[in-house]
Amino acid sequence: MAARLHLRLGPRLRGFASSFAPLLAAHPRALPLSRMGSVAPLAAARARRGFGSAVATAPPAEDEDFATAADLQFEPPLKVVKYPDPILRARNKRINTFDDNLRSLTDEMFDVMYKTDGIGLSAPQVGVNVQLMVFNPAGVKGEGEEIVLVNPVVYKMSKRLLVYEEGCLSFPGIYANVVRPDNVKIDAQDVTGAKIKVKLSGLSARVFQHEFDHLQGILFFDRMSLDVLESVREGLKDLEKKYEESTGLVSPESIENYKGRKDLISFSR
């Protein structure tokens, strides 16, 4: 689905997205995810079997810093941050203030997502380094489920792995295969601060995992195999060059010097 994901998935997922959309009912974005009428039961039914052991995504430490009011400030209209801007690698703080400003931020994120033909967006992608994501697998305003997840923690992933072509609004024009688990189980909070448990599968699980990676400072090429990474090398170099030309700064990352990420949970077959 080359057109619908801040994670923009490649052409092979277009049909999957269109077939999934009718299963999603219209839903107000402030409604807690635990009460979603269609996505949660559907995902739970698909995720009943095949979960592996707990993954290394630990709860926050007691002394972990939370986002301040300044961390959550933003000026509309929001713009998508492009690779290799260091904002995409920066630490994203947890949120403990659930107010009108947070609701406004999620509203703005949805607006950007729809305007850029996305189906998911993380806060760091619009320059706000906090643990927040929004997504709607339908990809159309007024259709499907508008989902907001705050401070998400993954506690289980399925052993079943799937390969799909992904893209990302922060990497315009770049698409490549990424391996990810088909199902995930999540602890999070909704936009009101209520604690929720979520089970996701299929497209929703993939969108979530792509966005969740952003919240950890992980970019989708970090999960590509060496041969797949080689296929997008020139595209990444072009983005690095554009960054230097537009900012007058040396690119903070260089694909030519990239050694991979050793801190990732491996999804390789």
Swiss-Prot record:
Inactivation phenotype: Chlorina and retarded growth.
SUPFAM superfamilies assigned: Peptide deformylase
Compartment list: Plastid, Chloroplast stroma; Mitochondrion
Known cofactor(s): Fe(2+)
MF GO annotations: metal ion binding; peptide deformylase activity
Protein residues bound to Fe cation: 168, 210, 214
The keyword Nucleotide-binding is assigned to this record: no
EC code(s) of this entry: 3.5.1.88
InterPro entries: Peptide_deformylase (IPR023635), Peptide_deformylase_sf (IPR036821)
UniProt note on tissues of expression: Mainly expressed in mature leaves and sheaths.
Any Gene Ontology CC annotation: mitochondrion
Residues annotated as transit peptide in the record: 1-51
Record's function text: Removes the formyl group from the N-terminal Met of newly synthesized proteins.
HAMAP family, A to Z: Pep_deformylase (MF_00163)
PANTHER family xref list: PEPTIDE DEFORMYLASE (PTHR10458:SF22)
Stated name of the protein: Peptide deformylase 1B, chloroplastic
Protein species of origin: Oryza sativa subsp. japonica
Gene that produces this protein: PDF1B
